[in-house]
């Protein structure tokens, strides 16, 4: 086991606990695993129990060698319907407020475990940016599961607040034509209207949870992460990625990766995540990639 732990990079992957976030993070985790990484995938206890009821006992330990599941609480009381979808704003607020401590405890347990390689990196959902608030001694990358256009839009939520576009004065602004206000100052999105931006801007609440989280994500979480992962590349989303770089000048992205051949016989050796990253910040912080559907 000593030789195993010395050579195999170990990435902890933590998605936001909603289906549209779990699936992309799980896909990325499986792709990393196929390239030689040891993976710890972190679910919330509530979602893990739902998966166990759906797929049967032992599902989390069956199948892939070097791919394990761990759980942390989400901080919410269990709903009366054990299969119900949780309220997203409440879940966002709760994970931000309560998940760092149990995640820290999990990282400590992994560091003491003799049967797993040392953790060499963390890939966190962009909506779980509390992971950048702690010095875990390894790079923390944020994976934003929405499009590059969505990411670039989120980067401007704070400026929309500062310029007075949002929160709305009252609910009449939802129907009086105000949402058709042109927003012509976002580079790459010059011909959009307020209604075309993420729906969080339509709130009338100055303390809106989702609005606050989006502002913090762009102002604090992304700049403090080792990098940002987007499922795209320059040839596809060049203007949006140029905009993201202008917001975070320490970040860049590689050119479009070539699509792997299904019959490729290239060795599945570990790539450079974790093992060759000397600190928690790199110049090439935005990572673009092609996610082939192989699982």
What spans do the regions from the language model cover?
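Glycosyltransferase specificity loop/lid
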Residues: 1-295
